[in-house]
Amino acid sequence: MQRDELEQQLAQGVRRFENCAFDDEDLSRLDLQGCVFERCTFAEASLFAAKLARSHWLRCRAGGADFESVDAVDARFDGCDLNNSKWRRSKLASAAFHGCKLTGASFEEVAHLGIQFEECLLVGADLRGFSFRKATLKELDFSDAYLSGCDFREAVFEGGSLRNATLKLAKFQGADLRGASIEGVRLTEAGLFKGAVISHAQAAAFLRELDLIVV
């Protein structure tokens, strides 16, 4: 479906779209507030500055899509492929991502108060400066992610991974990391976990990096 067709549908009051292909389309600045997209494709599409507040995305594929400067407050994404999507300067307050693939996604300078990720792949994602303070993080794979300056204070990790993530200046005081994989964390970064709760196995892994034998 091309932009003009979508605009016609919206003008007629249509707010639900199923099995539509918007690949490579320029959908920038469209008002899609409250729309529902189910099993639609948006590969490499541009939604620059689109209004997506309260929209619902179900099992959509939007690899490489540009969501820069969108207003997606209270939007919900369920089971979507959003690999390598770009969200720079977007408004994502109270948005929810459940069961989504966000490998390589970029979240630079986003407004994210109350955002929720659950059972998501965030491998290699750029989440620098995000606050997850006091959040319960369920099955989030942050492997190789850019987490510099993130605030994980008092967060609880239920599964998931921080394997080989970039953690410079991240804060973990009071965080419960026992459920997460922290393999690959460099010893020089171990101080970041001061005040965090880790398991005996995780502590032993740190000691092995010092070439100490744990018995």
What are the residue ranges of the model-derived segments?
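Tandem repeat scaffolds
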Residues: 1-215
